[in-house]
Amino acid sequence: MKRLCIARGVFALVTGLLLQGAAVTGHAQSTEIKTEYLMTYMAPLDAPYPIDSSLLIVNVKPTGGWAKGPRISGTFIQPGGDWLRVMPSGALRLDVRATLKTDDGALIYISYNGIIQHSAESAEKMNKGELLTTKDIPYFITAPTFETSSPKYAWLNSVQAINKVVELKLGEGGYVKYDVFIVR
């Protein structure tokens, strides 16, 4: 009983301090998330290689990928890859690694994870190699981070971004295109 009273007292103290801090700073917990457009990028894809019933590997082709935005522009170079894990729910969990060479020669490593949830219709279209757009896929969000030694792009080392799929096509002429936003 004594431990329960102490635990309640500690909880009340911590809660009071948190509420007092919010009142002093004028910053209550906010659920608003702001984003800033960073770039659009496109990466050409090979057909997936099924490793087993739950793992697909998609090779990012060595040429043809690009990134364009107000503060950054370049092309994707090797190495790059896209691992897709099929979850028991049917959702796909992504693990992607890519290298961007900017137009001024800087190298930026991009790594992201995310989730794709297909509807029966979007899965069928994807399996047929048809073009899918944002409106076709119920949920396709990834969260990239960046690493670079370039002083010009060092600010990327300190931001979290989100990708929203724009287009996806598998099979012949396959590619993925994202709009990328910095989370503020």
Give, region by region, the residue ranges found by the protein language model.
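Sec/Tat signal peptide C-region and signal peptidase I cleavage site
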Residues: 22-28
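Beta-strand-enriched cores of mature, soluble protein domains
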Residues: 28-184
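Bacterial N-terminal signal peptides
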Residues: 9-22
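N-terminal secretory signal peptides that target proteins for export/translocation
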Residues: 1-7
